[in-house]
């Protein structure tokens, strides 16, 4: 069942986006910046961590749902797990939409 969830377009789009960002080096500290960059993860790493987190929450929700169907998990845990996964997925979709919107806006800028 998790394989069918993985085919969700938002998950695939975020995965491809994080791979592209990691390959291109977008967000690396080598680019000139007006303000010194604080030590931390690059933009690509953050996106990669986010997609991994969403996938993990979807897996947890699926496992909890299966336990609930078997009668091994209380309904409250099942609902909580599914709602958390849904919220993570909605957040990922919103971030994807903002990234696409920013890309389109930048691509329309005159050079």
UniProtKB/Swiss-Prot annotation:
Record's keyword terms, sorted: Bacterial flagellum
Single GO term (MF): structural molecule activity
Annotated localization: Bacterial flagellum basal body
GO biological process: bacterial-type flagellum-dependent cell motility
A Pfam family matched in the record: FliE
Main location: other
Disulfide bonds: none
Ranges in coiled-coil conformation: none
GO CC, one annotated term: bacterial-type flagellum basal body
Keyword flag Chaperone: no
Record carries keyword Hydrolase: no
Similarity comment text for this entry: Belongs to the FliE family.
PANTHER family: FLAGELLAR HOOK-BASAL BODY COMPLEX PROTEIN FLIE, PTHR34653
Name the record gives this protein: Flagellar hook-basal body complex protein FliE
Organism of provenance: Brucella anthropi (strain ATCC 49188 / DSM 6882 / CCUG 24695 / JCM 21032 / LMG 3331 / NBRC 15819 / NCTC 12168 / Alc 37)
């Amino acid at each position: 069942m998790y394989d069918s969830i993985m085919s969700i377009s938002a998950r695939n789009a975020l995965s491809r986006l994080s791979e592209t960002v990691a390959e291109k080096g977008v967000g690396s500290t080598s680019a000139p910046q007006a303000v010194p960059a604080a030590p931390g993860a690059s933009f690509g790493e953050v996106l990669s961590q986010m997609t991994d987190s969403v996938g993990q929450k979807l897996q947890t929700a699926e496992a909890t749902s299966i336990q609930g169907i078997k009668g091994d998990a209380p309904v409250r845990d099942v609902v909580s797990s599914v709602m958390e996964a849904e919220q993570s997925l909605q957040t990922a979709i919103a971030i994807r939409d903002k990234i696409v919107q920013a890309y389109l806006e930048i691509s329309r800028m005159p050079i």
